[in-house]
Amino acid sequence: MSLSAADIEFEEIAFTPRQEAVLECALGLLVEGGEKALTTAGLARTANCSKESLYKWFGDRDGLLAAVVAYQASKVHFPPESGATADAGTFRKHLTAFATELLAVLFGETSVALNRLSIGQSNRDDNRLGRLLLVRGKHMISAKARALMEAGRHRGYLKFDDAEEAYQVLYGLAVRDVHIRLLLGEKASEEERDLNGQAEVAVDRFYKLFGA
């Protein structure tokens, strides 16, 4: 897999275990030292791989940054539609699992650090990280979540007029103001760290609004 700066739309990218290990190292460099710390030489040294392998896998530095963000977003998993919508109970479990993984990614140290870094660069015209976090992160996840909800509506498990509106409601119920408080340096409470419990409450409330 080779990723260029232009390849930042919604196509699926499958990383090998070795590539995932390298991208974890890249995330670590970004969190610790910011975007300037993510160099091919530094990553090759930290991940114990050659610069040639990095170029082969990810292309140039923009491609590497795109791959890092795509890898982080890929930690939110989506099941095949046929499996997710087998019955009403299964669909609800998958929706809860999605909300749990979304919270795990958003509330995790890595995501918080990446968002802080992007916010710090928001007044720059070349804020590549911010654009990638939107396109390869937020927009990709929301597009897949809308598709999951549409599948649930098609099977009669949910009722809504607009999938984007329904998703934003679920997002708000699950995330609330916790993410912004984490970005501002506040620690999550013990209750807020119970991600599955928070997701279940959010989905319960969501079904009161949109359950068929």
Predicted features by range, described:
Residues E20, E24, R116:
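Short alpha-helical elements of helix-turn-helix
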Residues A70, R92-D125, A174-V178, K208:
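Helical hydrophobic small-molecule/effector-binding pocket
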Residues A104, G108-A113, L117, N127-H154, ...:
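Amphipathic alpha-helical packing segments from all-alpha helical-bundle domains
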Residues A21, L29-G63, A67, Y71:
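Helix-turn-helix
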Residues F10, V69-F98, L106, A145-L148:
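Amphipathic alpha-helical linker/stalk segments
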Residues G63, A97, A113-L117, E165-V169, ...:
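Amphipathic alpha-helical interaction segments
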Residues E35, F58, I119-D125, R136-G137:
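Short helix-capping/turn signature of helix-turn-helix
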Residues M1-E9, A97, E101, A143, ...:
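C-terminal peripheral helix-coil segments that are non-catalytic and often amphipathic
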